[in-house]
Curated annotation (Swiss-Prot):
GO terms for cellular component: chloroplast stroma; thylakoid. The gene is RCA1. This is Ribulose bisphosphate carboxylase/oxygenase activase, chloroplastic. GO terms for molecular function: ATP binding; ATP hydrolysis activity; ribulose-1,5-bisphosphate carboxylase/oxygenase activator activity. ATP binds at V167, W168, G169, G170, K171, G172, Q173, G174.
């Protein structure tokens, strides 16, 4: 039973089994041909023999309504099929013989979504929390860094975005570690520099190094990987700390180079290499303790956006939970420990946890002997020693915390440098031992 199909273009002639073996069934649904076409049948075929049954395909005046399709139509949902079983079209490519592969992009053999995109969308996780690998990220810190980095990769109308973000604050407050957590959260592998690289015996070497690292990060961005330039302790390498530091030519060139990059972030050239091609813009994140020691034009608002990091009580508790996360310390004990030391930096609690292991190390040394420590730790066939995790109670933590605080007080109180200049005696060095009763033991 052949039927002639007439369309605007050339349409292949095909055999259409309109009835099968029974009677009364209509031709194939117009949904088979797409949503924008409809079928006009001149007459209904009453029996299995079709003499000259012809139908015409013309453009539809309106979209096909699902209510017009009958339940008996086996192809009624084919035009709207976006089910996952169509993934089999692409999964078989390259895995089975081409004889058994369905033709691509022909008829119904059209993958609604590729397998890679389907799996990626199915496995994607949207993490908007401020926890990374069990470590706490302060919400204000996360917000500042993510917004600054995102702005530098956007094209905002008539907006000059500062290239440099300066994170500064007290010592030991976790500025660098919080930055690294944010980078890990965003999937960024930063190009890192330290203050020690901002000085050299050769004039101009640090400035050239900054440009090299910047262009290295720019090349990574061109390859489709988000990257930033991260400089630790900028004020220690480029700042002036009173009369104890000497301002060198390299300090001047480092400041001038950062100012120039902030003004022209897409035109950073190396000495002797000048090309007209613009490089990708790279956000710069710097940390420091006191930005007032830096060159004032460098830290002006158009070049550097400044963020003073002063963790709140909630931030300190959150970070300490991450520090003691594997030790089984109750949350109420962590809160009490933090509240009893409000003036201490966050790094204090990390040093406190490390101090608790002193007893375990002391036991191990007494077991192997002092003379065998080197053989057991360096290139030992037995491997490094392992310890059972010590139980950390609040009383033990408070005891070691008081010891750390006492050492801090000794440094501030016993200033031997001033004593050496003023008198020949040792000052408070022996006086402490005499008062404590340990001098004559």
């Amino acid at each position: 039973m052949a039927a002639s199909l007439s369309t605007v273009g050339a349409v292949n002639r095909t055999l259409l089994n309109l009835n099968g073996s029974g009677g009364g069934a209509s031709g194939p649904s117009s949904a088979f041909f797409g949503t924008s076409l409809k079928k006009v049948i001149s007459s209904r075929v009453p029996n299995s023999k079709l003499t000259s049954g012809s139908f015409k395909i013309v453009a539809a005046d309106k979209e096909i309504e699902e209510t017009q399709q009958t339940e008996g139509d086996r192809w009624r949902g084919l035009a709207y099929d976006v089910s996952d079983d169509q993934q089999d079209i692409t999964r078989g490519k390259g895995l089975v013989d081409s004889l058994f592969q369905a033709p691509m992009d022909a008829g119904t053999h059209y993958a609604v979504i590729s397998s890679h995109k389907y799996l990626s969308a199915g496995l994607r996780q949207y993490n908007f929390d401020n926890i990374k690998d069990g470590f706490y990220i302060a919400p204000a810190f996360l917000d500042k860094l993510v917004v600054h980095i995102a702005k530098n990769f956007m094209t905002l109308p008539n907006i000059k975005v500062p290239l440099i973000l300066g994170v500064w604050g007290g010592k030991g407050q976790g500025k660098s570690f919080q930055c690294e957590l944010v980078f890990a959260k965003m999937g960024i592998n930063p190009i890192m520099m330290s203050a020690g690289e901002l000085e050299s015996g050769n004039a101009g070497e640090p400035a050239k190094l900054i440009r090299q690292r910047y262009r290295e990060a720019s090349d990574l961005i061109k390859k489709g990987k988000m990257c930033v330039l991260f400089i630790n302790d900028l004020d220690a390498g480029a700042g002036r700390l009173g009369g104890t530091t000497q301002y060198t030519v390299n300090n001047q060139m480092v400041n001038a180079t950062l100012m120039n990059i902030a003004d022209n972030p897409t035109n950073v050239q190396l000495p002797g290499m000048y090309n007209k091609e613009d490089n990708a813009r790279v956000p710069i994140i710097v940390t420091g303790n006191d930005f007032s020691t830096l060159y004032a034009p460098l830290i002006r608002d158009g070049r550097m956006e400044k963020f003073y990091w002063a963790p709140t009580r909630e931030d300190r508790i959150g970070v300490c939970k991450g520090i003691f996360r594997t030790d089984g310390v109750p949350e109420k004990d962590i809160v009490e420990l933090v509240d009893k030391h409000p003036g201490q930096s966050i790094d204090f609690f990390g040093a406190l946890r490390a101090r608790v292991y002193d007893d375990e190390v002391r036991k191990w040394i007494s077991g192997v002997g002092v003379d065998s420590v080197g053989k057991k730790l360096v290139n030992s066939k037995e491997g490094p020693p392992t310890f059972d995790q010590p139980k950390m109670t609040l009383d033990k933590l408070l005891l070691y915390a008081s010891m750390l605080v006492q050492e801090q007080e000794n440094v501030k109180r016993v200033q031997l440098a001033d004593q050496y200049l003023n008198e020949a005696a040792l000052g408070n060095a022996n006086e402490d031992a005499i008062k404590s009763g340990s001098f004559f033991k």
